[in-house]
């Protein structure tokens, strides 16, 4: 279980500061181990029997309008209502989830309102930078131009794969890039996103771990063969409204399967697709998603 506070202030026009302190308690099923596509995106990689405090987000966002048609923001969690133009630049700095900006999807991104399975909330092969709770420190910039958006980001990796502590100096880091195109088919909105990532840090190769295990007669362990390496991957993300409430979505991704994943989960290939039919009372995009990690 968790309880999260969403508090923000608007220091000047276009500027926002948000803080999300959180109280957590409990464990994922089997300590969140045993399956790469874990069935609950509300489960963290760590757990405690007693309630504990975490500062999950503390970030600054600046929106710079560049003209074009009106595209106002509506008020929601971690977002003030604001006048915006279709052409704009958005800068985000601080501690937040990589998934707050990258690989979003109207129908499959928020485990509290959409689907629960990890590779449906994010592309399973998207080894996004995060601590064990799913958040990182860094910066992202977004450039909106008509139906197009281009995004780039730089984030700290955790000190060790799946670790609780993040780097502070970008000595181990992730670079993210994304391009999005929004469209209409008939009168129904849709979008296509292509996301790429590049992780640089101390990773282990599976073949090196196996070779060492054969040589020493011990169990394979990638922690024993970690060295400075780069791991890259890419994914495609599609959403399309069918009716006012029903939509379809799909993701497909690929990453280097010879190197251990760093901060998300153990996928080298992924290709889910599904149909979203919410209950009459359900509402999508009501809160920023939690960002699960395994």
What are these regions (language model features)?
Residues 1-4, 8-10, 20-22:
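N-terminal regions that are enriched for targeting/export leaders
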Residues 2-4, 55, 134-138, 172-178, ...:
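Transmembrane beta-barrel architecture of outer membranes
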Residues 5-9, 58-62, 93, 139-143, ...:
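Residues on the lipid-exposed face of transmembrane beta-strands in outer-membrane beta-barrel proteins
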Residues 14-17, 66-71, 147-152, 185-192, ...:
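Repeated loop/turn-to-beta-strand initiation elements of outer-membrane beta-barrel proteins
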Residues 19-23, 91-95, 152-156, 192-198, ...:
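Transmembrane beta-barrel strands of outer-membrane/channel proteins
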Residues 26-28, 98-100, 123-125, 157-164, ...:
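Sequence/structural signature of outer-membrane beta-barrel proteins
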Residues 33-57, 67-178, 220:
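Surface-exposed coil loops of outer-membrane beta-barrel proteins
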Residues 184-284:
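Long, well-ordered mid-to-C-terminal structural blocks that present hydrophobic/aromatic surfaces
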